[in-house]
Curated annotation (Swiss-Prot):
The modification N6,N6,N6-trimethyllysine is found at K14. It comes from Pinus krempfii (Krempf's pine). Its main location: plastid. Binds 1 Mg(2+) ion per subunit. PANTHER family: RIBULOSE BISPHOSPHATE CARBOXYLASE, RIBULOSE BISPHOSPHATE CARBOXYLASE LARGE CHAIN. This is Ribulose bisphosphate carboxylase large chain. The keyword Membrane does not apply. HAMAP family: RuBisCO_L_type1. The lineage of its organism: Eukaryota, Viridiplantae, Streptophyta, Embryophyta, Tracheophyta. Substrate binds at N123, T173, K177, R295, H327, S379. It comes from the Eukaryota. Its EC number is 4.1.1.39. One of its GO terms (molecular function) is magnesium ion binding. The record marks K334 as: Transition state stabilizer. The modification N6-carboxylysine is found at K201.
């Protein structure tokens, strides 16, 4: 044995493989205020104890690897390692456990959602000792969240920019999502905004295709916004999708939107990536643009109950990375979303301080220390009959977005917008008068339809449309 080997051996190095739980399962550990905490739903392979599975997650998402290594002796593992500090069974699920893991703050680069996710979920999800793994929640300590800018502006600043208070905002996604020329697209934008909507929207996959290049779309939409504003006296906007193949091209599109004088741009934050999103959010704050976020691809990550990542984690990540709006499901429409779960992450988007509440899927108390809030956007398969429920569920600080529920009106786009605006104003007035929208909502809509032919026609066309499927994402 060489002197060098003897020296290493003398300080305790022993080659080989040992159980993760001997190092990374520490039930006696007291979490620190500066720790990032994670709740993982763990499904171990048969024969793997839950303590070993939880410790493996902590190890592989922090300092560990499959064998002991010489260089462990060159640093302080106790300072840098993740620790599985608690494990509890999942009620009603065989061989599933919630493993709680604490990560020291020094493991993560400041202001980088990209680095945070690369560490915590970047590699461990393919680990063979686990049949499945899902990240249910994260606790972001103030000492880390304060390293992020967060949303470019936030809810209150947006309301001040738009001069709109006391009600949800109304939007519409232009349909068909693909195939329209830029001029016809701009026409639809104008008609919807003139009819009473606050916003219209590019669909998530509208970027710069052969049938409609981005610059042409931006110009025609800006013209539509200006014309609708002049006719209605209200501030209007269209979510111009700046998502592109490179960050440089994305910023170029945002710069052109600013030069046109429009109030808001849009980004697909999951397909575009967190680094691109944070870059765009910084540009938007510096240049007075609101930022609408679409969550395209989220269901690939969050829909399965035992594997992936819950949307509440993606919502927290977006609040740190930056966005003024984000799509959040509807509860009542065509897209996935159970009520208590949805309201849990809606609060995580909007509020400053959110208490732990397992009945709504919130595993940790979260303190955002005055980071601006994000408006949830309810969009997907909704129409005028849903308006009372949406107003009651989401409250004023939200965007209610009707695509087919506007453009599918039998009389055209502008009447469809009128119908939605009348329905919303009726629901807000009824709520302010103390009426119970959950119980009296349909009657409120019927009463309003007596005074609005556009609303009456919408009520007739969509009276039988429902999306009654059980939610997959249940507590």
């Amino acid at each position: 044995m060489s002197p060098k080997t003897e020296t290493k051996a003398s300080v305790g190095f022993k080659a080989g493989v040992k159980d993760y739980r001997l190092t990374y399962y520490t039930p006696e550990y007291q979490t620190k205020d500066t720790d990032i905490l994670a709740a993982f739903r763990v499904t171990p392979q048969p024969g793997v104890p839950p303590e070993e599975a939880g410790a493996a997650v902590a190890a592989e998402s922090s300092t560990g690897t499959w064998t002991t290594v010489w260089t462990d002796g060159l640093t302080s593992l106790d300072r840098y390692k993740g620790r599985c500090y608690d494990i509890e069974p999942v009620p009603g699920e065989e061989s599933q456990f919630i493993a709680y893991v604490a990560y020291p703050l020094d493991l993560f680069e400041e202001g980088s959602v990209t680095n945070l996710f690369t560490s915590i979920v970047g590699n461990v999800f393919g680990f063979k000792a686990l049949r499945a793994l899902r990240l249910e929640d994260l606790r972001i300590p103030p000492s880390y969240s304060k390293t992020f800018q967060g949303p470019p502006h936030g809810i209150q600043v947006e309301r001040d920019k738009l001069n709109k208070y006391g009600r949800p905002l109304l939007g519409c996604t232009i349909k068909p999502k693909l195939g329209l020329s830029a001029k016809n697209y701009g026409r639809a934008v104008y008609e919807c905004l003139r009819g009473g909507l606050d916003f219209t929207k590019d669909d998530e996959n509208v970027n710069s295709q052969p049938f409609m290049r981005w610059r042409d779309r931006f110009v025609f939409c800006a013209e539509a916004i200006n014309k609708a504003q002049a006719e209605t006296g209200e501030i209007k906007g269209h979510y111009l999708n700046a998502t592109a193949g490179t960050c440089e091209e994305m910023i170029k599109r945002a710069v052109f939107a600013r030069e046109l004088g429009v109030p808001i741009v849009m980004h697909d934050y999951l397909t575009g990536g967190f680094t691109a999103n944070t870059s765009l959010a910084h540009y938007c704050r510096d240049n007075g643009l609101l930022l609408h976020i679409h969550r395209a691809m989220h269901a690939v990550i969050d829909r399965q109950r035992n594997h992936g990542m819950h949307f509440r984690v993606l919502a927290k990540a977006l609040r740190m990375s930056g966005g003024d709006h984000i799509h959040a499901g509807t509860v009542v429409g065509k897209l996935e979303g159970e009520r208590d779960v949805t309201l849990g992450f809606v609060d995580l988007l909007r509020d400053d301080f959110i208490e732990k509440d397992r009945s709504r899927g919130i595993y940790f108390t979260q303190d955002w220390v005055s980071m601006p809030g994000v408006m949830p956007v309810a969009s997907g398969g909704i129409h005028v009959w849903h308006m009372p429920a949406l107003t009651e569920i989401f409250g004023d600080d939200s965007v209610l977005q009707f695509g087919g529920g506007t453009l599918g009106h039998p009389w055209g786009n502008a009447p469809g917008a009128v119908a939605n605006r009348v329905a919303l104003e009726a629901c807000v007035q009824a709520r302010n008068e103390g009426r119970d929208l959950a119980r009296e909502g349909n009657e409120v809509i019927r009463e309003a339809a007596k005074w609005s032919a556009e609303l009456a026609a919408a009520c007739e066309i969509w009276k039988e449309i429902k999306f009654e499927f059980d939610a997959i994402d249940r507590l």
